[in-house]
């Protein structure tokens, strides 16, 4: 790191242009129709169910890591520290659970969408309720937040006005994904992950090395721990000002499980990749690969935020960066500027790679969300209620149109998110108002045969006012605890309502679960145990 002029050099622009050309080229190549055929709905929405494990795993991470992580989680690293990494490290365990216990049931049912599974297990009414919810969530929360945070990064790094940045990112994602569907998204995701890891590693290495000075990278880590010991605590106590965001041990045994199980197990734009795998075994291998990658993500996105905190707190380090150090300076109120601020000081060429990584994080997530929004609207709304007799060609075109409309709406709303502070925490908190109720429906629907459609509908509808009550009641409570209590409340409501209908009989649509469904091969088991051992070591080191 050094005193670098604001913006990108010609070399950086060329590096980024090469990245853009590769992504668009691969996307268009994969998108082409086979000679004499047109894309079917399975081709467009599930990549023809042909994905190998490594493509599934890479695409899961590319869909997951977005501006929400690079910008939002780095901002939380600046404000909170390594404790925010629990979202990533606990996700690794969650992925293993999803791969072993949830995925076999979904693939056995041969579904396109999560709402479709809801109809098979419950009824059309609940499916429609959840389909509308997910479409709204993807457009008004996920797409808008990724566009806003990505636009914020471009504005900080290049000085491009926020609205133009948002429109540029939207157009980029649309160009390579709209025609080819999930195939284009997944195969470009494989390339995106390479840039994500490389760019994230470069930023982390150079930021920490700058702190270490002539003593090197490891000395930089040691200096960071000495300068900000509170930023290297995984479990926060009640005296910590960030306890309400990450409430101590409850992170490991409470509400974070709600957020992770919902996100990785029942989130359309995540689970869609596993549904597109060649087989259950390939999907499970892909999930383990993604779990391994989750172990390293905090070192790519959280550590730079902590480094930015240490640098901005040290007058000598700030002075050595020159006058540009005061440009777009992060603070407690503007923590999300931490990562873009760091990129100002990267050497020529490296900045281009990091900028490509940031763009990869943003556009891969945008493309994933667009494809999933289109899939749910087309298969669960349009085909169900508007045109049941539509053929594959018509449905694929409807999906493309739905993606464009969703993106236009998100672009109009995204600039309104300005001034939300720690965007990552904001997104988790407001998604957490609805995720516990949905998780309760799926957990009981999958594993308790007495769960009825009436119980599920009443439970999920009742969960939202209960969650709002916990959020706005006079006695403050960490939002992770709110999620856990909302989950338990919803499960009680569902169970009570279901039993009041029929206390003895199973629901006719109940799923018969046998132990043979959850048998995994030796490689999956070895990898799963290895990941859990690594997690135990990490939490022991940073407890």
Curated annotation (Swiss-Prot):
UniProt-listed PROSITE patterns: NA_SOLUT_SYMP_1, NA_SOLUT_SYMP_3
Gene Ontology terms for molecular function: D-glucose:sodium symporter activity
Compartment list: Cell membrane
UniProt-listed CDD domains: SLC5sbd_vSGLT
Entry membrane topology: Multi-pass membrane protein
Pfam families in alphabetical order: SSF (PF00474)
Superkingdom of the source species: Bacteria
Keyword Transport in record: yes
Membrane spanning stretches: 10-30, 45-65, 79-99, 129-149, 156-176, 193-213, 246-266, 287-307, 345-365, 401-421, 427-447, 455-475, 483-503, 523-543
Keyword Ion transport: yes
This protein's GO CC annotations: plasma membrane
Principal location class: membrane
Keywords: Cell membrane, Ion transport, Membrane, Sodium, Sodium transport, Sugar transport, Symport, Transmembrane, Transmembrane helix, Transport
Free-text function comment from the UniProt entry: Actively transports glucose into cells by Na(+) cotransport.
Similarity remark: Belongs to the sodium:solute symporter (SSF) (TC 2.A.21) family.
Protein's name according to its UniProt entry: Sodium/glucose cotransporter
Provenance organism: Vibrio parahaemolyticus
